[in-house]
């Protein structure tokens, strides 16, 4: 296919292995790649925007090489994509990829996901966009995730990407030979047991660390074909999960319009 102009962002920051793998994978296929992402870890920032302080962008080409242009920005993931589209890029991209995230973005986790928010900025601007995550914080082999996300993107673009469709791809932490087939999935509802750790600083002021653990994964948020499994259940059986969402969160369009990816 003709080389694509691809914008890549994330919420793990410019030094994360996932985004470097994704950018290198895209460039190796001949695509023109630009990276605009946070200059440090900004996970779980959701769709937050920076309105009360300046956003600074510093060139970071040397972190990627291979002709990839890159910036590290002081803003949120959503800030980064907005800045790229309105100031840093000479041309509108054909595709936006967000990730590869270090950790899952499953079910209702997408509400607080900076990875999904960055991709959603592209969807809101009419650009085909995919959020890509490896469903483990410890897994460090991102090569298959990079390959699969680009295979999906290229195939979907060739089939005329439907308006308002955002694809949320989660890949299980296992070797490719052990992995099941990619399938369409529905969003799970993830319920957490929230925990706050109370501490006191050297000046006697109380502060808190928030932690939470998923204690219940309901089968589905109730939208989509009933024959589709939930995204959480797919990852649990070591199979990649591909969930179509849109700005009001679930794809409610004509199912015949979905790209033929499975």
Swiss-Prot record:
A divalent metal cation binds at residues 11-12, 43, 101. Nucleotidase that shows phosphatase activity on nucleoside 5'-monophosphates. It catalyses: a ribonucleoside 5'-phosphate + H2O = a ribonucleoside + phosphate. PANTHER family: 5'-NUCLEOTIDASE SURE, 5'_3'-NUCLEOTIDASE SURE. It comes from the Bacteria. One of its GO terms (cellular component) is cytoplasm. The gene is surE. Its cofactor is a divalent metal cation. This is 5'-nucleotidase SurE. It is an enzyme of class 3 (hydrolase). Its main location: cytoplasm. Gene3D superfamilies: Survival protein SurE-like phosphatase/nucleotidase (3.40.1210.10). Its EC number is 3.1.3.5. The lineage of its organism: Bacteria, Bacillati, Cyanobacteriota, Cyanophyceae, Synechococcales. Belongs to the SurE nucleotidase family. Binds 1 divalent metal cation per subunit. It is found in: Cytoplasm. One of its GO terms (molecular function) is 5'-nucleotidase activity. Keywords: Cytoplasm, Hydrolase, Metal-binding, Nucleotide-binding.
């Amino acid at each position: 296919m003709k080389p694509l102009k691809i914008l890549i962002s994330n919420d793990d920051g410019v030094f994360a292995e996932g985004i470097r793998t994704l950018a290198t994978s895209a460039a190796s296929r001949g695509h023109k790649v630009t990276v605009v992402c946070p200059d440090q870890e900004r996970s779980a920032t959701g769709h937050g925007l920076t309105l009360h302080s300046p956003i600074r962008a510093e060139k970071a080409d040397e972190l990627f090489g291979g002709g990839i242009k890159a910036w590290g920005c002081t803003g949120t993931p959503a800030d980064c994509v907005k800045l790229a589209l309105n100031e840093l890029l000479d041309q509108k991209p054909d595709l936006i990829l967000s990730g590869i995230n270090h950790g899952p973005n499953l079910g209702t986790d997408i509400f607080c996901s900076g990875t999904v928010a960055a991709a959603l900025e592209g969807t809101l601007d009419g650009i085909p966009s995919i959020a890509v995550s490896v469903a483990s914080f410890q897994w460090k082999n991102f090569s298959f995730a990079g390959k699969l996300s680009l295979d999906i993107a290229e195939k979907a673009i060739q089939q005329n990407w439907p308006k308002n469709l955002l694809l949320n791809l989660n890949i299980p932490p296992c070797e490719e030979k052990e992995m099941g087939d990619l399938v369409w999935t529905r969003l799970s509802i993830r319920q957490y047991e929230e925990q706050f750790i109370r501490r006191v600083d050297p000046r006697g002021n109380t502060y808190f660390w928030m932690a939470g653990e998923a204690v219940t994964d309901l089968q589905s948020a109730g939208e989509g074909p009933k024959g589709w499994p939930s995204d959480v259940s797919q990852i649990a059986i070591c199979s990649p999960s591909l969930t179509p969402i849109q700005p009001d969160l679930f794809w409610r369009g004509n199912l015949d319009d979905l790209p033929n990816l499975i």
